[in-house]
Amino acid sequence: MAMLARKEHERRLESGELETNWVQFDEIETFEHTKFRPISVALAVRAKTGEIIEVQAAPFRTRVEQHVPLKYKGEYRPDHRSVAIEDCMLSIKKAARSEVNLVIESDESTHYAKTIKRVLPKSRYRQLTSPRVKNQKDHDPLFMINHICSRLRHDLSRMSRKTWVTTKLMERLQMHLDLFIAYQNGYRLSA
């Protein structure tokens, strides 16, 4: 079913059904079986409609090597976040009406700017901050991506921070994310 969802999503990207000029991009973190095997999930969303353009999971190294238990000490963990970000940017390029008018918004992470300039050199890239204090009067400029990220954490049990249901294989997480794309974008899948 996940393969059907991915094929349908690719078809809609190629046909131009997800065309946009305004994209929001972010990453969320989860883990594979244990917190010492972190996974980054790169996410690109149409800012007006909330439709998902791309979701890619990739492993990365733990930040604090000294606190890793002995059984994970010798384990090499590659950092493929940049590959996931580049895959998302290539999907954004497919969905862009025109690269000149494309606006990409994200949080203040320093990982995104180089990849955006390399893959989408003519697009405009804006780094925004969400308000720290949550008042009703405050406007969150990254509301749509933050909303989709929170729905992802809520709707997918394996994305929850503290849970009995954890991801054992990153490939299965990617399949689950592909199904979430189909659900969020309203695709009708027939087996």
Question: What is each of the regions a protein language model found here?
Answer:
Residues 1-191:
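Residue-level recognition of single "structural anchor" positions
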